Design a protein with these regions (language model features):
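Nucleotide-binding/hydrolysis machinery
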Residues: 4, 11, 18, 22-24, ...
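Conserved post-Walker A coupling segment in P-loop NTPases
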Residues: 24, 37-102, 113-129, 194-199
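Amphipathic alpha-helical protein-protein interaction surfaces
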Residues: 31, 44-47, 141, 177
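Short, conserved clusters of charged catalytic residues that mark active-site
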Residues: 33-34, 104-107, 120, 163
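Helical "lid/switch" subdomain of P-loop NTPase nucleotide-binding domains
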Residues: 62, 87-91, 96-99, 104-111, ...
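Loop/turn-to-beta-strand initiation segments
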Residues: 116-119, 135, 156-161
Length: 200
């Protein structure tokens, strides 16, 4: 039975390595094999994951690997660095009808609501503005949130995977990123090596 389980494990890891290759990620090195094994292990828990690494190393692919191993639908991704703060907030939290000028008359569901029991991938988390750092920390602590303009709390059941190419430890020391949020995100730390370090 153990031998069969080991064969199945190797097969699933190889499937993930092929997935890396499909996305032009060099995936046959020992380092990437270890990452595939790590993705399998962390797929069975709901803890928050913080993925670090240079731009283009495949942080989003690692998130997809977690989803595949867990047998869950693909994640909902949002980049924290590409949107103005007010728009990013409404995308994450949603809003009630008439919450602000120009708001949809029927309101809007945000990513925390749309994700359900799935996975939210917060890319470029190091770009998150200070006010939203506070709000995200509260969501992770309480596992609930409020739509903009809302008074009724809503459950946040999704798993959060965050990614950055920045040195968040350094930014915590400098005071530009909240220490408490960093520790909430960094429950399972994953560092993806740069391409130049992936020897076959």
């Amino acid at each position: 039975v153990k031998e069969k389980a080991n064969r199945e494990l190797v097969q699933r890891i190889n499937e993930m390595l092929h997935l890396m290759e499909d996305y032009d990620i060099v995936g046959r090195s020992k380092a990437m094999h270890n990452l595939a094994e790590l993705a399998l292990r962390v797929s069975h828990v709901r803890s928050t994951v913080l993925i670090t690494g240079e731009s283009g190393v495949g942080k989003d692919v690692f998130c997809r690997m977690i989803c595949r191993f867990a047998g869950s639908p693909d994640y909902i991704k949002i980049s924290c660095g590409n949107l103005p703060e007010n728009l990013l907030e409404s995308e994450l939290f949603g809003y009630e009808a008439g919450a602000f000028t120009g708001a949809n008359r029927t309101g809007k569901r945000g990513i925390f609501e749309l994700a359900g029991d799935g996975v939210i991938f917060l890319d470029e988390i190091g770009e998150l503005p200070p006010q939203l750092q506070v709000k995200l920390l509260t969501v992770l602590q309480d596992r609930r949130f409020y739509r903009i303009g809302g008074t009724a709390p809503l459950p946040m059941n999704a798993r959060v995977v965050a990614a950055t190419n920045r040195d968040l430890k350094k930014e915590v020391a400098q005071g530009s990123f909240r220490r408490d949020l960093y520790y909430r995100l960094n429950v399972i730390p994953v560092h993806i090596p740069p391409l130049r370090e992936r020897t076959e």
